[in-house]
């Protein structure tokens, strides 16, 4: 974005307001970021695609056809350098010009000026564009009954510098799961489905290991993958989960059986209690029902290629919220920091292993895959309501601003000594778009969901089990249902992202955009694109409802 607006270089720092002394004592006294701590990270334009910038959409194998570096669209066109706030202070202190808006100001002991100048900086960076191998570690335990149905569990193993919290805190939980499952296998136990454990390399530079593996094996994964379960950093606190809403009921059932090590109650009950105290109004019904809602996933970890590119149901799970987390992506993400400020008793790594282990084992041994459609129906209905309301909000905002410009309100309150200030531009008023296709699709989805829930409840009443042949036919539909939420041509301006319900923001990065093709067109006031995308997204939702109808039909057969 900086380059698009004319910047020729970019220096990034983490302000102490975000995770430094504004939050608490800095390391080593406390856990927050000190003045020498710089936050590393990838500045690849991953909202276009993740993975190797030179091989978009294909695996980065030795003989893969590669783009030239200058032609890779995710590689930034300007130099970028992260520094600490201690190093940023003299640069910011030397800036002149007008004061920054209040929401741009941090916690450094200086007035925050916008510039330009009079300070000048010489930015010199060296780049190494050599190709180097990365190493994914993959372990496979074949299923005894359904070997062609795969449950995949992953966490990355690379880190910036020491990486005690990110990724090791999550990786050790996965390794312990794998060790325990290995002991079961040694005793003669066999899973029904194939279980794959993966430790991904190159996550930090751009989800390289997971993306290239997923792209290399794309056809196999679309055919055989059931669910991908991801974890990353982990620390003391509350259970958090995001992912495919068809897995929401399944996750709630599993975490009822995991005990929180600090409180001695289930991690579900603890998360529900947090929602009761701090949750938004629309979450209180979930809290009363003693359930947690899965968050929709954008990007930022290794679930991205599975969910967003291949349409494979995915989860991202972990614990956190109570540690002092100021070491992120720095040299201070060390063992010492972790044992003092993240998870001193190593209890929440055990909790993560127990949680993910339950999810893994229940998935690989389920006679019928645990996808349910009611939570997805509720979520999509909410997302459609949001984009309709967004359009109304944008229309009102434009009408209000334009009227104030006509009435010279901004001119009347303008401070003549602030010469940098200019009145905001006029806004294009949103037309009254036709959302009927989306609303009708939601109605179709609701009807299909209700029919499936009724049929499944009847088929399993009184503890009845489905005949094997019927269960197999049903599973074949359930495991690929998420793929019907994708579109082969992908999202506007980024065909790699094919999921029509969840995507990272094109301009906002990791954070999720739901119904992205419609929502982002509205946010950019591109009414023509929004009009074109509404029926396409509606058709995708109806296609998903069609898969539910197929599943219902299977349950109705004798």
What are these regions (language model features)?
Residues 1, 137, 153-207, 212, ...:
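Alpha-helical metal-binding/catalytic segments enriched in His/Glu/Asp
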Residues 1-35, 144, 148, 158-160, ...:
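A conserved hydrophobic secondary-structure block that centers on an alpha-helix together
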Residues 50-165, 179, 183-187:
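Soluble metallo-hydrolase cores and metallopeptidase-like ectodomains found primarily
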Residues 119-123, 153-168, 194-198, 236-237, ...:
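Glycine- and acidic
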Residues 467-558:
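C-terminal amphipathic alpha-helical interaction region
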């Amino acid at each position: 974005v900086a380059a698009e607006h004319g910047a020729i270089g970019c220096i990034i720092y983490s302000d102490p307001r975000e995770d430094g002394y504004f939050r608490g004592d800095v390391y080593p006294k406390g856990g927050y970021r000190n003045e020498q701590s710089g936050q590393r990270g990838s500045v690849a334009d991953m909202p276009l695609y993740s993975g190797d910038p030179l091989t978009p959409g294909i695996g980065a194998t030795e003989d893969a056809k590669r783009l030239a570096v200058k032609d890779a669209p995710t590689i930034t066109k300007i130099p970028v350098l992260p520094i600490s706030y201690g190093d940023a202070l003299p640069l910011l202190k030397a800036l002149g010009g007008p004061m920054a808006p209040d929401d741009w100001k941090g916690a450094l002991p200086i007035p925050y000026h916008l510039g330009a100048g009079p300070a000048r900086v010489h930015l010199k960076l060296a780049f190494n564009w050599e190709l180097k191998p990365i190493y994914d570690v993959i372990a496979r335990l074949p299923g005894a009954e359904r070997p062609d149905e795969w449950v995949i569990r992953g966490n990355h193993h690379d880190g910036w510098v020491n990486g005690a919290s990110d990724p090791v805190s999550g990786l050790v939980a996965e390794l312990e799961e794998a060790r325990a499952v290995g002991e079961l296998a040694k005793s003669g136990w066999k899973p029904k489905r194939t279980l794959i454990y993966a430790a991904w390399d190159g996550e930090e530079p751009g989800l390289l290991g997971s993306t290239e593996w997923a792209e290399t094996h794309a056809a196999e994964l679309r055919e055989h993958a059931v669910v991908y379960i991801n974890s990353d950093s982990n620390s003391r606190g509350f259970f958090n989960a995001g992912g495919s809403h068809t897995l929401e009921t399944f996750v709630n059932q599993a975490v009822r059986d995991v005990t929180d090590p600090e409180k001695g109650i289930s991690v579900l009950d603890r998360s529900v209690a947090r929602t009761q105290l701090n949750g938004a109004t629309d979450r209180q019904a979930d809290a009363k029902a003693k359930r947690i809602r899965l968050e929709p996933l954008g990007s930022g970890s290794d679930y991205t290629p599975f969910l967003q590119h291949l349409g494979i149901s995915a989860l991202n799970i972990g614990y956190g919220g109570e540690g002092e987390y100021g070491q992120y992506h720095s040299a201070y993400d060390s063992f010492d920091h972790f044992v003092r400020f993240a998870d001193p008793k190593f209890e929440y790594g055990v909790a993560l292993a127990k949680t993910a282990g339950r999810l893994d084992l229940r998935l690989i041994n389920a006679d019928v895959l645990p996808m349910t459609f009611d939570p997805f129906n509720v979520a999509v209905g909410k997302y459609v309501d949001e984009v309709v309301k967004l359009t109304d909000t944008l229309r009102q905002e434009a009408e209000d601003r334009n009227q104030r410009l006509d009435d010279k309100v901004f001119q009347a309150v303008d401070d003549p000594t602030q010469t940098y200030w200019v009145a905001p531009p006029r806004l294009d008023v949103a037309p009254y778009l036709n959302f009927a296709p989306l609303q009708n699709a939601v109605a179709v989805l609701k009807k299909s969901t209700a029919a499936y829930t009724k049929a499944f409840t009847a088929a399993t009443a009184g503890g009845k089990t489905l005949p094997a042949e019927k269960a197999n036919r049903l599973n074949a539909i359930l495991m690929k249902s998420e793929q019907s939420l994708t579109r082969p041509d992908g999202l506007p301006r980024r065909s790699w992202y094919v999921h029509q319900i969840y995507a990272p923001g094109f301009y906002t990065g990791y954070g999720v955009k739901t119904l992205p093709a419609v929502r982002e067109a509205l946010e950019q006031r591109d009414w023509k694109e929004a009009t074109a995308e509404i029926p396409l997204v509606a058709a995708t939702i109806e296609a998903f409802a069609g898969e539910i109808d197929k599943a219902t039909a299977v349950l109705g057969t004798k």
